[in-house]
């Protein structure tokens, strides 16, 4: 054997071993650093969606980071210079505060205040980096080629200062305002939430739904039927709302009169009488008596008003309105200029001692209020109503709608621009553009920005007691106002900054809000660069960024806020392309969560599964479709792509080393198989590039799976004799050259997805660079593509696969020759020589449809025939048993009819099926429109030839175990039993030729290796012939 040019994969080496070896190589040779510095002719701007490192990275994070890495590696290999190839860390907000509260055992905001904001925030600051080392370790193991040396961190003063600059800009352009209004509110966290936060926390729940009667003022026995799913709001009732255009009826029921929407009356009442009909606007202005007489209603309340939001789809068509606890209700109260009635504190408990439910959490009081209504004759009907209700997306508490002072960004005023900029974005999957994301833009609400919390970017607004407002846009402005800039811009230090109001001379104090943490991550495009205070970000060239990706919930989270801020600030979409990723479920298809105990942490799982195998699994199927974390699927996908490609390489390396082959460029292909594979290689490059460019990475995996399968199970199997030839001929060198090119090309195509094994193969094949990731993505040579040849060979492979499948079904091994194979369909005759090399058949024939050895069976299709034949159906069905199935088939072809017992039957009335005719002894299967028939009758001669092939296989295995070269000659001793003796007698020459055997000795001898073949056991010994 020649000196080894191509390293052999050590026996027992796993994919995990290879991945670890390459990771060490990258570290030892600073490969990532060289990737980061790689220049390019095209610009690609990356943006990392910042995680919070106060929790461990789970398996879903590993998938997201894999996809980011694929994009980075592919664009690096295709000549792009990657800008901003660094990570980011989200550091503020409720997620961090809640973990801190859990650590300290705090239950309310008061606990934090009593403990001390400074100490609490100090803990929060430290906690956000608790697992940062684990995150970076996972990034390294999974192969995420990101530069952590330049990570942006949202808690840094520079980041906060950039946000202040933008907030001041938004304020000065009239898009940031303060209002007292009803907002989504979490009573556990004691803070309001934005619409995009609320959108992430909806759950389907069953709440009590009640129909209650409000007595019309001044009437004897007349009531309004009002409906609500929040009985706890009834003590705060101020109005009843009707739709001005809906028809209402005054009905009589059980000696009482009721106003109700005409279309809903029959749902609420039975056996009622309609007294009068009117439109909703005719009810406006009517007064009614207070339902629950505990609180003092404000002047102007307790009357019927109109509102377009009322419908008659459900309920009664009359809505009870408590302006303190509903957005529409609040607007009604504001329109009617009536103060709100709010007996609920910020903890979500009734706080007015006059109420029987004082001190209770409002939602927990629902049932007690219903009992009160029933006992006092105020309840008409109650039931459970299933609807979607918002919960706090962080602490899982049901939200309230609650009146507060808050600062808002006027997103509604730029809604049209948001929609317009969305049209410039490429979405994957594309239905998000006008679906989940686009619909949210169409209804974009003003952004509730302020949070009455502690750990976050401080809202930079100062106010004096005369209500003069000053927005600060930089640290320098604080100095200009005569104050000292604290070293840390967070609370409580920023709260201590006070200055003189330039308008009135009074002291200005900061309003004690922090901002929505989503504004932090949504500012990453510019704040990460300390814009505009450092000259390293130019919106005209650095926006939009090229690509972002995160989980599906971020379409209404990070994706949304990026889009809003960029549109308002720069009048541009924030990103060109966005890929949304669905969830990794557990093996049973359940969503993972800590509470269920089925969470899988990335670092733990990567100790069990090779990173390349896991990465490949992540892209086995579209990433926007959920997939179960199934180890069997991971192993199967890895086997089909990675293991098979490694086996192909092993075959190449072993044989190339024997023959001293050295790749010096692709040789001119003369063999049909070489021409086909070279054509396939170039088609593979084109299709893979297209899939990568379209962000269809799962399609790259499918294409690679098909290519590796073609390479291993078709090209290599049909070409192996060329590699085993004794002499190093021109044909053999061409085969080596073609196989080398196929392995190298496949490695480069797979490099972004399977970075470790691809680099292992690249280095083993002596690629020209230190790493495959410093090389370029392969370019296709379209002149080498022969679509007709590919089509023919694809058909040949399809036939070969079908024959293999039939053999497996009828338990005839591939080494056992069969008498005949028949092919029927649109078959290219030129494939026959190729097919014959692999299917081990004495004869292959193409036959017409009529010549197929089939038996036709015919029966009635009862669903269509029975209604027509009626009482004759059984007699016709019996008569069909005596009719030739083929004749029936021919009769109904092309719209014809079959006459049976004076009935004319059409093809739609018949079930005509075919099975192989048992008289001929064939088994059948079909693929891609080609019928394949394998004759399963084996005669004596064919049977003996099959045994001879079994002997050859065992001798070849023994040669391999002895590490013999293919050129080494051997002597063989066989102790046969039964039919094996006849097989040796008849096929001795064949056995000797196939095994490089000089002498074949039959009979018992010492040191025989026992082999079980079928039901027999034979002994074989081989010995290398030493040249004299």
From Swiss-Prot:
Keywords from the named record: Aminoacyl-tRNA synthetase, ATP-binding, Cytoplasm, Ligase, Metal-binding, Nucleotide-binding, Protein biosynthesis, Zinc
Motif extent ('HIGH' region): 51-61
GO biological process, one term: isoleucyl-tRNA aminoacylation
Molecular function in Gene Ontology: aminoacyl-tRNA deacylase activity; ATP binding; isoleucine-tRNA ligase activity; tRNA binding; zinc ion binding
Cell compartment(s), UniProt: Cytoplasm
Annotated positions binding ATP: 594
A single cellular component GO annotation: cytoplasm
InterPro entries, A to Z: aa-tRNA-synth_I_CS (IPR001412), aa-tRNA-synth_Ia (IPR002300), Anticodon_Ile_ABEc (IPR033709), Ile-tRNA-ligase (IPR002301), Ile-tRNA-ligase_type2 (IPR023586), M/V/L/I-tRNA-synth_anticd-bd (IPR013155), Rossmann-like_a/b/a_fold (IPR014729), tRNAsynth_Ia_anticodon-bd (IPR009080)
Keyword Kinase belongs to the record: no
Catalytic reaction equation(s): tRNA(Ile) + L-isoleucine + ATP = L-isoleucyl-tRNA(Ile) + AMP + diphosphate
Motif ('KMSKS' region): 591-595
Presence of the UniProt keyword Manganese in the record: no
The protein's Enzyme Commission number: 6.1.1.5
Cofactor(s) required for function per UniProt: Zn(2+)
Gene3D superfamilies documented for this protein: HUPs (3.40.50.620), Isoleucyl-tRNA Synthetase, Domain 1 (1.10.730.10), Valyl/Leucyl/Isoleucyl-tRNA synthetase, editing domain (3.90.740.10)
Primary localization class, coarse: cytoplasm
Domain of life: Archaea
Subunit structure of this chain's protein: Monomer.
Function (record text): Catalyzes the attachment of isoleucine to tRNA(Ile). As IleRS can inadvertently accommodate and process structurally similar amino acids such as valine, to avoid such errors it has two additional distinct tRNA(Ile)-dependent editing activities. One activity is designated as 'pretransfer' editing and involves the hydrolysis of activated Val-AMP. The other activity is designated 'posttransfer' editing and involves deacylation of mischarged Val-tRNA(Ile).
Record comment regarding domains: IleRS has two distinct active sites: one for aminoacylation and one for editing. The misactivated valine is translocated from the active site to the editing site, which sterically excludes the correctly activated isoleucine. The single editing site contains two valyl binding pockets, one specific for each substrate (Val-AMP or Val-tRNA(Ile)).
Family: Belongs to the class-I aminoacyl-tRNA synthetase family. IleS type 2 subfamily.
PANTHER family, A to Z: ISOLEUCINE--TRNA LIGASE, CYTOPLASMIC, SOLEUCYL-TRNA SYNTHETASE
Protein name: Isoleucine--tRNA ligase
